[in-house]
Amino acid sequence: MAVAIAAARVWRLNRGLSQAALLLLRQPGARGLARSHPPRQQQQFSSLDDKPQFPGASAEFIDKLEFIQPNVISGIPIYRVMDRQGQIINPSEDPHLPKEKVLKLYKSMTLLNTMDRILYESQRQGRISFYMTNYGEEGTHVGSAAALDNTDLVFGQYREAGVLMYRDYPLELFMAQCYGNISDLGKGRQMPVHYGCKERHFVTISSPLATQIPQAVGAAYAAKRANANRVVICYFGEGAASEGDAHAGFNFAATLECPIIFFCRNNGYAISTPTSEQYRGDGIAARGPGYGIMSIRVDGNDVFAVYNATKEARRRAVAENQPFLIEAMTYRIGHHSTSDDSSAYRSVDEVNYWDKQDHPISRLRHYLLSQGWWDEEQEKAWRKQSRRKVMEAFEQAERKPKPNPNLLFSDVYQEMPAQLRKQQESLARHLQTYGEHYPLDHFDK
């Protein structure tokens, strides 16, 4: 009996935070476990009424030795709004977005898809050095971006180009970054797809996994201290969630009560490592309650489910100063990057299922068609127009020179120190002597 009671309490803890999905998040007075608690008043009890007084946990004593089995805890449910045919399942969960906003969602997703195809092929042709596509995960980017304020700070990993796309980041700057030309905001110093834009509150991407998580928590803590009325959103994958930085960030956010949304894209693979080898527990959302973080699991291929969850998490994170964890279940249809061949670790049939049967773009297109907001002629015209827009930006980026080599030494110090100036002069002498061995005509003078 004691075993059953203990197991039921653990089960209720996990289910209680996600069973009702957004209904729970919408409770106006509810607070996550991250809230600070007043010191517990020590009381005297008789031996017959002995209750735990430990300050580190809320629990009861039991008198039988038993370890809690992980399989006793049911999986956190997956919240969704639309089925795979684009039909609203529960009318009360319909976000009732206006036609213009839904069309922007769709056009952002399809434009991103078109850009991915062109830049992937350009890398295969040797025109750029590296690329990472977003196939199959467009709904997680755009659905979450649409639910944020434009001033909310974004910390991405390396597969969130759709967030910038939704914030109207110009195609010319996407291309400039991948080509590393003179129009690149980062002046050619980053790998391709490592975007950043101060004006759109998108922090420059860093390659090392999960380093952005504690950084994002620090930014959220600063926003809280400044009463900035903004949220920080931090994107990462289920593989990055295994890094130590993720665990430190979760605990930091909970104990300091930071207005942050942890957004995990669980796409099934961390490069070649499947989720079955990545963790043994119930995914990433199940970790939230252990840190005292309000958590939810959503269908990442349902752009409306992603929108609703992010919208509500944002509202409460700002109003109540507490962190939220969203695990968006999706699938990485493309290779991890142009350096990867995913056929070595997964089947073509597996990929085709997600591409043909459960793609976020197809699901939203079904919704648009059912509403009478889109038709086949508009689809053909938009596909043609979007490809033309991407190709124009692509050709423009290809014609522009690379940044001047002297920019290697700028933007670190307000005034260049003597040692750095010495290195700059050394490079200039080297290029003057051996310039014929370098493609200097490709660089800005």
From Swiss-Prot:
Cofactor(s), names only, from the UniProt record: thiamine diphosphate; Mg(2+)
GO cellular component: branched-chain alpha-ketoacid dehydrogenase complex; mitochondrial matrix; mitochondrion
Keyword Oxidoreductase: yes
Effect caused by changing A285P: In MSUD1A; no effect on solubility; no effect on mitochondrial alpha-ketoglutarate dehydrogenase complex assembly; loss of 3-methyl-2-oxobutanoate dehydrogenase activity
Residues that hold thiamine diphosphate according to the record: Y158, R159, S207, G239, A240, R265, H336
Location in the cell: Mitochondrion matrix
Post-translational modification (record): Phosphorylated at Ser-337 by BCKDK and dephosphorylated by protein phosphatase PPM1K.
Annotated phenotype, changing G290R: In MSUD1A; no effect on solubility; no effect on mitochondrial alpha-ketoglutarate dehydrogenase complex assembly; decreased 3-methyl-2-oxobutanoate dehydrogenase activity
Signal peptide: none
Outcome (variant: Q190K): In MSUD1A; decreased 3-methyl-2-oxobutanoate dehydrogenase activity
Phosphothreonine modifications at: T338
Pfam families, sorted: E1_dh
Residues that bind K(+): S206, P208, T211, Q212
Molecular function terms, GO-annotated: 3-methyl-2-oxobutanoate dehydrogenase (2-methylpropanoyl-transferring) activity; carboxy-lyase activity; metal ion binding
Quaternary structure (record): Heterotetramer of 2 alpha/BCKDHA and 2 beta chains/BCKDHB that forms the branched-chain alpha-keto acid decarboxylase (E1) component of the BCKD complex. The branched-chain alpha-ketoacid dehydrogenase is a large complex composed of three major building blocks E1, E2 and E3. It is organized around E2, a 24-meric cubic core composed of DBT, to which are associated 6 to 12 copies of E1, and approximately 6 copies of the dehydrogenase E3, a DLD dimer. Interacts with PPM1K.
Protein name: 2-oxoisovalerate dehydrogenase subunit alpha, mitochondrial
Native species: Homo sapiens
Lineage: Eukaryota, Metazoa, Chordata, Craniata, Vertebrata
Gene responsible for this protein: BCKDHA
